[in-house]
């Protein structure tokens, strides 16, 4: 049976995600920004937390681990390259590993750039990509620990996934991302359509996630830094993708 996925808010603008296998009863939380909303979502559904899949070591993604571990004795799965930054880790994973959540399979992709230890979890059978702070809808994460070329390569890893893959990202930043992207590609019809959709969703108080990766490939300027229209939009006609991506990210940092 397909995974059941629940989306809710943690902290100010983090997304909380539960991924449930109804056949086995196993449930994973993608990251653990804070415990209370995750425990509340579990209680609403009548689910038991069996796993936390950690994407990276930033505090707003791991702050609830200790309380959740104490409450549920769940397994904590985390990237291998993080030293002691992530607490109570039971299983460390790297590129190509597959984590079992009951009968569900989560494939690990290393996506460094935002942090050096960042990973994404891909549920191929369920067409679900949990990209955390590497790829946002119509945006990408800041480059805190890695380099711009490293982050671009990580985005390319995600871009090759199927168009019907659903993107679940780390934060509700989509409205701000759309505003910035329209300064680069104001005449992109896919971006214009996404802008209208996002405005409707936010007015209704609804999350802008999930979105389809195929739509992101057409509308997200950060995924399209190798497109001539994006290069022209930042006055770098003829420049290489890394140079264009760097300019995009630095402009977004200042916006």
Swiss-Prot record:
Zn(2+) 1 binds at residues 56, 58, 114, 133. Pfam families: HAGH_C, Lactamase_B. Its cofactor is Zn(2+). Pathway: Secondary metabolite metabolism; methylglyoxal degradation; (R)-lactate from methylglyoxal: step 2/2. One of its GO terms (biological process) is methylglyoxal catabolic process to D-lactate via S-lactoyl-glutathione. One of its GO terms (molecular function) is metal ion binding. Keywords: Hydrolase, Metal-binding, Zinc. Binds 2 Zn(2+) ions per subunit. It comes from the Bacteria. It catalyses: an S-(2-hydroxyacyl)glutathione + H2O = a 2-hydroxy carboxylate + glutathione + H(+). It is an enzyme of class 3 (hydrolase). InterPro entries: Clx_II_MBL, Glyoxalase_II_hydrolase, HAGH_C, Hydroxyacylglutathione_Hdrlase, Metallo-B-lactamas, RibonucZ/Hydroxyglut_hydro. Zn(2+) 2 binds at residues 60-61, 133, 171. Its EC number is 3.1.2.6. Thiolesterase that catalyzes the hydrolysis of S-D-lactoyl-glutathione to form glutathione and D-lactic acid. NCBIfam families: GSH_gloB (TIGR03413). Monomer. PANTHER family: HYDROXYACYLGLUTATHIONE HYDROLASE, HYDROXYACYLGLUTATHIONE HYDROLASE GLOB. Belongs to the metallo-beta-lactamase superfamily. Glyoxalase II family. This is Hydroxyacylglutathione hydrolase. It comes from Rhodopseudomonas palustris (strain BisB18). The gene is gloB.
């Amino acid at each position: 049976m397909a995974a059941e996925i629940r989306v809710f808010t943690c902290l100010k603008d983090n997304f909380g995600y539960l991924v449930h296998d109804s056949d086995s009863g196993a449930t994973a939380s993608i990251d653990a920004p804070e415990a209370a909303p995750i425990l509340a979502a579990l209680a609403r559904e009548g689910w038991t937390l069996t796993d936390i899949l950690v994407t990276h070591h930033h505090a707003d993604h791991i702050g609830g681990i200790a309380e959740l571990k104490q409450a549920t004795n769940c397994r904590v799965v985390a990237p291998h390259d993080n030293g002691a930054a992530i607490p109570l880790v039971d299983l460390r994973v790297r590129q190509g590993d597959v984590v079992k959540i009951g009968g569900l399979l989560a494939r690990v992709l290393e996506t460094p750039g935002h942090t050096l230890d960042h990973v994404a979890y891909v549920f191929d059978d369920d067409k679900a990509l949990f990209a955390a702070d590497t790829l946002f809808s119509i945006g990408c994460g800041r480059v805190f620990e890695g380099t711009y070329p490293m982050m671009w390569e990580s985005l390319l890893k995600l871009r090759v996934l199927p168009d019907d893959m659903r993107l679940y990202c780390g934060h509700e930043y989509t409205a701000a991302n759309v505003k910035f992207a329209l300064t680069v590609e104001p005449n992109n019809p896919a971006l214009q359509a996404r802008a209208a959709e996002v405005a409707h969703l936010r007015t209704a108080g609804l999350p802008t996630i999930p979105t389809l990766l195929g739509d992101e490939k057409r509308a997200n300027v950060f995924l399209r830094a190798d497109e001539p229209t994006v290069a022209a939009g930042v006055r770098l006609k003829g420049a290489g993708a890394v140079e264009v991506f760097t300019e995009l990210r630095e402009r977004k940092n200042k916006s």
